[in-house]
C-alpha cells in the first residue's frame, strides 16, 4: 500500500511538472501578431477602442477630443482641431493627434503614407512620436504623398504611446491632412479592450483640485522656454471642467496672443506672478465669452514697438465682446498700444484695483459700443495717451459707449494726453478720482471732427480732484475742457470738484460744434495762471461755485 501511494505521488508530481511545462509553452504561444488599422479601427463610440485615441496637443499637454456626429469625427467644441477615420486637421493653438497605445510588450512596424489634402495653405508639420521621443518628422507643402521612414521594428511596452501628430506650419488654413496609418504589432496579447486612458493626456492631472494649474500642462516658471502651449492647454481644460486656471508665482514666457474665453485665470499676486510676452506685435491677453476673469498677476512686454496703427494685438489686455467679465489686481507694465482695451460691444464688466504704467496708448480705453462697465480703484501712470478714455466713433461703432462708471482712480503722473476723457458717449459717471500731471486737460468731454466721434449726452463729473494738468505747450489745455468740433455735447454736469493749479488756465468750454447745457454746481476753482474760466460756447449754468 505504501509503495502504491509512493507511485501515485510520483505520478502526481509528474503531472504537476507537466502542467508547468504546458503553462510555459502556453505563455509563449500567447504572443500575437495583429495589424491595427487607423481607418478600420476608427470608433465613434469611445476613446481607446481598438487601442486608438483622438486628441489635441499644445506643448506637452494632450487633451481628449469629443465625437462630432455631424462631421463623423472627433473634434474640439469649436470644430478644430479634428481627427476622422482618414484625416486630421489642426488649428492655430492645438495640433491634431491620432494616438495608438500598445497593449503589451512587443515590436511594431508602421506603414502608410501621409499627404496634404489641398495644395493651398502654407503647409503642415507631421511627426510620429513614441511617448515623448520623436521617431520621424516631415514638413509637407504640397499634396505629394510621403512615407515615414525609420519606423520599423520599434520596441514597445504595455502602455507605450505612438502619436501621429499634425501641426500647423504658420497658418492652420487648408491644413486638412490625409493620414491613415497601419501598425503591425507582434508581442504579448495584453488587453484588447483598449479603453484605458492615454497616460500622457492632461486629463490625468489632478481632477480633485479646485483649480487647474498651468504646471500640470507643462508650464515651467523662471526659464526661457515658451509656456504659451501649456497656458492654452490649461485654459482649454479648465473650461471643460468649469474650474479656474491658477498660475503660481514666477515668470512665464508667452510667444503669442493668449485668448481666455469663459474661464477665470488667476495668479499668486500682481507682484508674484508675471506673464512676459516676447512678441511685441502679438502679445495681448484677449478676454472673450461670458464670465471671463483675469486677476492677481503682472503682464509685461519684453520689448515694445511703435504704436503705429494702434493694432489691438499689441495691447496688454483686450476685451473682445466679453460679458460679465472682470480684470482685477493686475499690473500692466509696458505695451505697444493700450493697457486695457474694452471693445466690440463688451458688456457688464469690472476693471478694479489694477496698476498700469508706460503704455504705448491709453491706459484704459472703452469703445466699440461697450456698456455697463465700472472702472474703479485703478492707478495709471505714464500712459502714452489718455489715462482712462471712453470713445465712440461714427464710422466703426454700431452704437455709442454707454453706462460707464469711472470712480476712485488715481491717474496721470506724466501721461501724455488727457486724464479722464469722454469723446462720444452717453450716461457716463466720473467721480472721486484724483487726476494730476497730464499733458492735456485733466477732464476732457468732447465730440471731435478729426476722429468723427459720436455725440456726448448725460455725463456727470463729481467729487474729483484735478490738479496741475494741461502741461503741454502750445496746446495750453485748461484743467477741465468741454469741446466740440462737430455734433452735440449736452447735459454735462460738474458737481463739487476741486480744480486747482492748472498749468495754463482753469476751465474751458469752446468749439465750433454744438454745445448745449453745461452745469457747474459747488465746484472749487483754485487758479493763478491764465484765465480762470473761458466759456465761449454753450448754455452755461453756474451754482454756488468758488473761484469762478
What are these regions (language model features)?
Residues 297, 330, 354, 378, ...:
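Consensus "Asn ladder" position of solenoid repeat domains
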Residues 108, 212, 245, 252, ...:
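Solenoid scaffold repeats with emphasis on beta-solenoid/beta-helix
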